[in-house]
Amino acid sequence: MSRPHYNEIAMNPELRRFPFVQLDVFSSRPFEGNSLAVFPDGRGLSDQHMQALAREMNLSETTFVLPRDPSIERERGVRVRIFTVKEELPFAGHPTLGTAFALRGSTGAADVALELNVGRVPVRFEESAGQPVFGEMTQAEPRFGLIHDRETVVRATSLRDGDIDPSLPIQTISTGLPFTIVPLRGLDVIRRLQVDLVKSSEYLRQTEGGTSFYFVTRETVDRNARLHARMLFYGGEDPATGSAAGCATAWMVAHGVAKPDERVLIEQGLEMLRPSRIFVRASRLDNKVVNVRVGGNVVEVVRGEVSF
């Protein structure tokens, strides 16, 4: 996507105002989880404007809601577009949950459906007295891809011999976006991760393994968690990756780490001091993993307005 010229954005004869809300997703407390900016009415914004605003917000993702006729929204869902600072995404987990939370607003709706570039994604909310609101999205049916050779992945990531858990497979799975799940031996291994992102990205490109590895270990900080996870990328680390967590959920149920329909906790973001709690579950039907659900809490931290 070409970079918009400054004058295209700034030199507008009429000043326009676009409210936004900033949320922390997969946390019940501010300043934890994964941050998200939501523009609840993006009508009138071009693709270039949306990309420029995502860069301005400088978060892992920013979403733009495009309201339309209520009858269409009831049938197809509320139209939402997701942008990183560099590009538009067809799907991402924490933007889906956070945007649905923002749309729910004061109505208290139990169900919110979004129409993303990947298709319709339903989100259901649960409320209990004295507890923060909990939202759970249903992701796309899992597609199981390549099971990778351990030694090849060690070379592609610059891991050490013996870092990978030999009892579980390294596998590419997609529930909307593909990720390659890499099981590691323990917390000591996952905490000292220093991945060669150039080599690993090239390997994933060649094997159609998605854009990122999702590193997990069954040794956890919270004894109630089932997995401890990290997701590294160029320029940093993701504190909570809902799309990858969906892939890991399908992987857990397929390989016996979690039982069908058992809701389990994935902890992520601890190494970057943004602890996140991602609750996941999936079903089995005719020996296939189906109905992958990813949920958590959301908290509002900022309200503001962008003018140009």
Explain the meaning of each model-derived region:
Residues R3-F91, L97-F308:
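Active-site proximal loop and beta-alpha junction motif in alpha/beta enzyme cores
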